[in-house]
Every structure is written in structure tokens, then in C-alpha cells.
Amino acid sequence: RGADVDNILNFPQEFDGTHIIKMEQNYRSDGNILNLANSLIGHNTKRHNKNLWTYRNPGVMPTYTYYASDYDETDSIVEDIKDYIAAGNNYSDVAILYRNSRLSYVIERSLAREKIPYKIVGGFKFFERAEVKDIIAYLCVIANPADDQRLKRIINVPARKIGAATVDKIATLAQQYKVSMMEIIRNADLYPAIAKAKPALDSFIKMYDTMCLMANGSTLGELTQSVIKYSGYRKMLEDKGVDGKDELQNVEQVVVAAEEFEHAHIKTNLSEFLAEISLLSAVDTLSSEENKVVMMTLHASKGLEFKNVYIIGLEDS
């Protein structure tokens, strides 16, 4: 990251007597794959020319298919995988590669809906990523104020001066009086144990009530976008700069997921969207670890081999 390719390209000019050795023979890929690779990389003008070759057979010709949208692309891939499995092959023979992990959501959605087991190498599934779980937790608490588990997750994310000790006291009071934690927070002035945290708790309730009001009359996408903004989550990630870029793109993808779900259903609500997410998150928990479609970035795939490989998101930019 941050490397300058000119250091390699200009090396012979900088150091007299440089001898370039080209490692062109490939022992792993079939001829048709190498021909495609040579053709593609040939468009790159800033490189030392070389031509990959092999003694292996030409093999199967790789195919390139253009799609109108990423959803069309992934739905087509999933149908192709289903045919591949129906022909007697294993899920573990299939790899789906992408340049950036943020591209994984759409293909995960399509795989999960068809109950195709998959695993992600070198990363987390979309709905297992911390920032995604945070936004989903906000939506869950809006849908159900008595969801104490999700409330614990987001009450101090971003930081609101509501520490772990205060949260534990709220949980203890809720258990003692057999009410939800939200009920305790709304009546913080009645409980001396959390009196010092009342200003911070009041601020949280004000923010929460604002988001609940937005849930009435807003689309799922608008509500999710509002949660990201008014919770302070967007600002928290933006303040992280480059380090928060991928996380911000992931939470924005939750907005896309909400919009896509709403477009696919004539009548829907927040609870139904959250139920869908729950199903997508748990689809392959009972399947064996070995026999799953493998998903990973191109970088993580180096040195690995699969019988059937899809590379998604190949776009001109």
C-alpha cells in the first residue's frame, strides 16, 4: 500500500548493469486462462512486458458476461452454482473472488436466500461485521424497545459517557423490577444508583425518540440513513479518516439492503426487514465447515486453487 511502481520500472536506468529475468512459465493455470491474463494486463502501459505461457492443455475457455446490475450478476452466479451442484459437484469446489470486501454483501444475500452455505476467508461475513451489527442493533431497538441485548450494544456507541458500570446497574435494576432497560433509562431520576448518569441517559433517550419518530412515515432506507446520521455513527467513522472508510461503506450498504428489501416487497415494515436479516445471518450455521462456497478477496486467494471460480465486480472506472 502506497508503493510507487516507478521504483521498479526505472530500476534499470538508475542502476547500470541491471539484468532483468522474466519468470514467464506458469505451472498451475491452463493455457486459455494465461492467454486471457496476457490480453488483460497488456492494456497496462506502465509495466515491464512479459508473456505468460505453460505446457499445460488449453483447458476450459473462461467466460465474461455483462450484467445490468450487481444484483443481476450475483443472481446469475447463484443459479449457475445450483446447476453445478446438481451435476454432482461440491460447494467447496467453488470460489467467488472480489477486489474489496465491501462487494461481498450482494453475493452473500443471493447465496443466503438460496440456502447455499458459504464461508469468507480472511474476513467476516457482512452481517458479522461490527459496524453492520451496530446499525442493525439500532434498528432492532427502534422496532422493539425491550430488546435489552441490542440496547446494551449501542447505548454507548458512539461514546456518550454511559460507561459499562452504569449499563450494568441499569441491567440489574431492570431485572430487579422486571421491566426493560429502556424503562429504567426513561425514569433514571427514580433510581439513585444511576443518578449521576442521568444527563447522558436523557440525551440518549432524546436521540432515540427522534429516530423512533422518523420511523413513522419514512422508508426503510430513509430510516436507516437517519439512524447512521443522528446516532453520531457517521461522524464517528468520518472522524477516523481513511481507517473508517471501509466501515462507512459497509454501513451505507445496510441502507442499500433496506432499500432493496423495500423495493422487493409491496407491503413491508421494519420488523419484516429485521426478520429477513436474521434469516440471512443464520442460513448456514448447521452446514459442515468443509463443504461451503469459498468467498475471499483476490489478494487472499493467491496460491489457492479451485475447480470453478467467479470474479465479480469487474468494472471500468
What are the language-model segments listed below?
Residues 117-127:
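A short glycine-rich beta-strand->turn/loop micro-motif centered on a GG-aromatic cluster
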Residues 7-10, 73-80, 134, 253:
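Well-ordered alpha-helical segments embedded in enzymatic catalytic cores
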Residues 3, 25, 69, 99, ...:
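Structured loop/turn residues at secondary-structure junctions
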Residues 90, 104-116, 129, 136-317:
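Conserved helicase C-terminal RecA-like lobe
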Residues 16-19, 24-117, 140-145, 212:
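Helicase P-loop NTPase motor core
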Residues 1-10, 25-29, 227:
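Conserved helicase NTPase motor core
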Residues 1, 8-9, 34-35, 39, ...:
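Metal-dependent catalytic core segments for phosphate chemistry
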